[in-house]
């Protein structure tokens, strides 16, 4: 009888651990779906829940930054971009978004520093860096 009880307890614990591992992905995927449907408040909630289960999920921070960009809350946008880069320093999308914020704030030295980093890590968005550098020259 005690063997069965131990097996049942171990089985339930394994299910619980597996459920927590999957829940983070479910929250992020649901948040992404809501974000793509422009339901930003609901998406924000899901990304925040994703972060609760996995504080090192750089994509959740990135999408929170995008939501704050839509809501014109630059302070929170920048905070989430910084968190993204703390976790994933080579995230070209986060670097690019910070460069745009730097341009808006006329912080040209920061933009140049970020541009150098961006040049080293860019894979998909390399043309965007050229546009920003042209804006700096003007």
Task: State what each model feature region is.
Residues 53, 87, 120-124:
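Structural marker of alpha-solenoid helical repeat scaffolds
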Residues 63, 97, 131-135:
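Canonical tetratricopeptide repeat
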Residues 36-37, 70-71, 104, 135-138:
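Register position in tetratricopeptide repeats
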Residues 57, 91, 125-126:
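Residue-level recognition of tetratricopeptide repeat
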Residues 50, 83-84, 117-118:
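Canonical positions in the second alpha-helix
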């Amino acid at each position: 009888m005690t063997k069965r009880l131990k097996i049942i307890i171990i089985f339930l614990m394994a299910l619980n651990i597996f459920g927590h591992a999957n829940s983070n992905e479910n929250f992020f995927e649901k948040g992404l779906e809501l974000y793509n449907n422009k339901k930003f408040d609901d998406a924000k909630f899901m990304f925040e829940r994703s972060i609760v289960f996995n504080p090192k999920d750089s994509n959740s921070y990135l999408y929170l930054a995008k939501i704050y960009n839509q809501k014109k809350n630059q302070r929170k946008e920048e905070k989430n971009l910084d968190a993204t880069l703390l976790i994933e320093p080579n995230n070209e999308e986060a670097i690019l978004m910070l460069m745009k914020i730097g341009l808006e704030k006329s912080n040209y030295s920061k933009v140049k520093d970020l541009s150098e980093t961006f040049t080293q890590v860019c894979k998909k968005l390399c043309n965007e860096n050229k546009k920003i550098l042209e804006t700096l020259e003007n």
